Each structure stands twice: as structure tokens, then as C-alpha cells.
């Protein structure tokens, strides 16, 4: 499947491919970042088990640990954010194929900034469910993330 210019385009292409292969609109699809190679089997099983009968779907997430600040464009703190209401979105994210396809396609037409599948579903008026996962399912985006992952995996032996 050919990737798109952004994540949403890549996922949309994958969903179109699934449709072409005979997948139904009410089939579940899971979207996972290749940049998150440390997904645990327990988290995957938990996500599948807790969302299988959910009307919308959802995603793995972890509660924010650190104090969070909202800043202005100059880097000045405007306020401290209540972290009890803030979660970090992880993957995989699990939604019905048809609903996710419509949400992504419509958001692209509307030129809405979509950062993950859950944000597309939110834009479409749905409320995805958060399933608490492990914090070590981190996204490898910085050199120190890769070094942490290498150390973690070398300790498994």
C-alpha cells in the first residue's frame, strides 16, 4: 500500500486497500505506529478485549505524569494544565473500518489537521475510549529514545 503525504493519507490508502480486499465497513481495524516497537502483548490483548463490543472504538493511552504548562508564542507560561485530565495518545488505535474511512476522508476534504485516527473520529463527532497501556510503548523519535529501547531490549536476554 502506497503511503500518503501525511499519516492520515497513508491510513486512508490502507483502508481503501482493505475495502478492495473484501473487508466490511463493520470490521475492526487497528492502526499502529512502526515507531512504537515496544508494544506488549498484554496491552494488545487488553485493547482488543475492552473495545470489542464498544460502539466507537478507542486507543491505548497513558495518563500524563509530568506537570504540563500552556505557553504563549514567546515561551512564557500562561498556566499550569490540570494533568489529571490529560492523557498521552499511543497506538494501536482501533476503530470500525467504515467509520474511520469516512472520518479520515471527510477531514481531509475539510482540510482539518488530523494527528491520529482518534482525532479524526473526534472530529466526526465520536468519543473514542481510552484504554490505559504501558508507558514503555514509547514512540521512537529522538536518538535517546532509540538508545533507551536498545538498553531495554538488551536487558531481556
Regions found by a protein language model. Give the residues of each.
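Conserved core of the sugar-phosphate nucleotidyltransferase
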Residues: 25, 38-129
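Short aromatic/hydrophobic "clamp" motif used to bind/position activated sugar donors
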Residues: 29-30
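Acidic metal-phosphate-binding loop of nucleotide-sugar-dependent transferases
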Residues: 7, 34-38
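Hydrophobic helical membrane-anchoring modules
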Residues: 137-157
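Glycine-rich beta-alpha junction loops
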Residues: 63-66, 135, 144
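Short phosphate-binding loop-to-helix
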Residues: 1-26
Amino acid at each position: 500500500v502506497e503511503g500518503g503525504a501525511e499519516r492520515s493519507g497513508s491510513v486512508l490508502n490502507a483502508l481503501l486497500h482493505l475495502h478492495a480486499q473484501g473487508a466490511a465497513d463493520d470490521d475492526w481495524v487497528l492502526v499502529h505506529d512502526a515507531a512504537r516497537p515496544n508494544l506488549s502483548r498484554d496491552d494488545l490483548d487488553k485493547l482488543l478485549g475492552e473495545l470489542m463490543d464498544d460502539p466507537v472504538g478507542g486507543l491505548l493511552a497513558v495518563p500524563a505524569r509530568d506537570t504540563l504548562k500552556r505557553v504563549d508564542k514567546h515561551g512564557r507560561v500562561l498556566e499550569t494544565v490540570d494533568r489529571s485530565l490529560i492523557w498521552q495518545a499511543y497506538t494501536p488505535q482501533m476503530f470500525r473500518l467504515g467509520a474511520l474511512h469516512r472520518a479520515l476522508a471527510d477531514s481531509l476534504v475539510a482540510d482539518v489537521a488530523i494527528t491520529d485516527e482518534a482525532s479524526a473520529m473526534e472530529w466526526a463527532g465520536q468519543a473514542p475510549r481510552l484504554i490505559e497501556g504501558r508507558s514503555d510503548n514509547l514512540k521512537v523519535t529522538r536518538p535517546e529514545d532509540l538508545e533507551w529501547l536498545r538498553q531495554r531490549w538488551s536487558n531481556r536476554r
